[in-house]
Amino acid sequence: MKIISLCLCALMMPLLLVAQQVKSPNGNVVVSFSLVDNGVPTYKVSYKGKPVIKQSRLGLELTPSQNDGIKAEDTNLMNGFKVSNTETSSFKEVWKPVWGETSSILNHYNEMAVSLTQEHPNRTIIVRFRVYNDGMGLRYEFPRQSNLGYFIIKDEHTQFAMAGDHTAWWLPGDYDTQEYETVTSKLSEIRSKMKAAVTDNTSQTTFSETGVQTSLQMKSSDGLYINLHEAACVNYPTMHLNLDDKNMVFESWLTPDAQGNKAYMQAPRTTPWRTLIVSDDARDMLSSNLILNLNEPCQYDDTSWIKPVKYCGVWWEMIVGRKSWSYTDEFPAVEIGVTDFSKAKPNGRHGATTAEVKRYIDFAAKNGLDQVLVEGWNIGWEDWFGHSKFKVFDFQTPYPDFDIKALNEYAHSKGVKLLMHHETSASAMNYERYMEDAYKLMNKYGYNSVKSGYVGNIIPRGEHHYGQVMNNHYLYAVTEAAKHKIMVNAHEATRPTGLCRTYPNLIGNESARGTEYEAFGGNNPDHTVILPFTRLQGGPMDYTPGIFETQLKNWSSNQSYVHTTLAGQLALYLVMYSPLQMAADLPEHYEKYSDAFQFIRDVAVDWDDSKYIEAEPGDYITVARKAKGTDNWFIGGKCDENGHKAVIKLDFLDKGKTYECTIYSDAADADYEKNPKAYSIIRKQVKRGDVLKINEARGGGFGVSLFVKK
């Protein structure tokens, strides 16, 4: 169903000193725009009468360019403006995502587009505001015009003036990685806590003592939840935020390229949306579709080949350190196309062997999993990292002990597919050189999804993971994959901004610390009750949950441990939404706890409806989801190191139906550090209106399945 209503009102007017307003459909969110001083564009935002963003400046700064006709005195797009036109409109539709947390999404907003003109030189930009019941988006637009055709953005100066010294859940600003632990502090404390927030990880490099990444979640002292992010980041660098901590004003901070410039533009063009989500209920932050709604509709006519995936794989044992991606220890350096692996002595630790992959295929087939990821199948892993090497992989040639043809045939005979792995070692140029042949190889053997990786320093050298060049590369990989009906799960790529609506074969991203960090010292217990408020605002995460043997030293030489209980791992299949979900542990570990593994067998990966029952950033999240095309529900609850008691009223169940309810929860003595594998399974019948009360241990959680009784 689609309902569209448009009402346009164009007003020619002189320079305004009074504010122009646009309100959300329900009137709760009010955005006011005005020009101040010497034609400086500003805006402010309120929610239910409370200030959210105080008067904040808008504008951009260009780089002088003789070729583009931009003189040094013409680089200012921050003042000297007059309002030349204002248009307001309303829009309402219901659209259906290819996959998602719900089967339909309401897109309802009021809009105001303000045309701003500078007389000398004569040029116009448009600032467009879209205001929703749960927030707003704004962007800059550059119409086709003679005095602003080609131009280079030196800096973007979009401000977000906070109304107080809010509590924030933040990551240090970084051009190349989001793999930090979240810091919780007042905004005024960011500067003092920045140094401790950075580890000696060589991939972590901050740009400012008060610079942070988006999505940034905050909470005001009077109970407002506020989130700053961006939507539809296309052909533009990723935005960070730099804080003036004397005045509590954030300003946009764009990722530079190798020359220090930010974005190369050709009109007509738009920037990404700068987004604000706001509510006095934390649950609204998690259920918001504002980011998705600000993206363009799906660009594909046929999406029948795009399917959510539940998978296992040859991965965790390498992450823990018990097996390796590389095939041999004989070659300190590899030259693709020259080095002969057929005569090399195997190191005995290689994970991606034909025999091992068959074992995982058998496990997947037995337990109803769709695919098996295999990392380390292709030549080149012996010297893949740290050398700024251009030609690292060819994405086509398997190691001698990996029979790509036989394994795919074996998998297909079992009703399972293999999931391809393309680690690029951040050599994007090399990947693009081989991409077409790599995708053709996948088509030849029946792969329909690929996990890509970008570990290391970017090639082209000097570029950053989150600059305009690489953002274009990531999207190019997705759109080229679509031509081959391939789904993409990109790791180490830029953080998502809702592009999965437009390109739904972008089925997963990493872009944060995932489960792998549990083998590198561990994630804090509150990690997975923060990420849904921050990282997941832009799109789903391939978090790779499901670790049952949480004490790694019990089965490997790794001394780290997973900072959740076993039941808490089950919760992640609901709390950490993704249409791509991994059963990440080893098959033999699941066999030891087959009764608990039943929840992973049963849980869906695509949904008709989702209900966030209770939530507080960094403390707890409880969510219920209805499996796509069924009457069955699943509930997940996760908490931090303090534990939690979830109270769940089953008022979302269908009237008149009885449900077989299975509760997988922490045992009374469970504790993520002292007794992580203590869990309880309770079965009973429930109906609409019943109440479940479930105790969550420190670092714990639970999963609940609700099947309609037949």
PLM regions with names:
Residues 1-21:
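Bacterial Sec-dependent N-terminal signal peptides
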Residues 21-302:
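N-terminal accessory beta-strand-rich subdomains and adjacent acidic, glycine-rich linkers
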Residues 266-359, 367, 371:
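An acidic-aromatic substrate-binding cleft motif
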Residues 356-377, 444-448:
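Catalytic domains of carbohydrate-active enzymes, especially glycoside hydrolases
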Residues 375-565:
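Aromatic- and carboxylate-enriched substrate-binding clefts and catalytic-loop regions
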Residues 567-614:
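Catalytic cores of secreted or luminal carbohydrate-active enzymes
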Residues 617-655, 702-705:
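Carbohydrate-binding surface patches
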Residues 683-710:
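C-terminal beta-strand-rich structural cap/linker in extracellular carbohydrate-active enzymes
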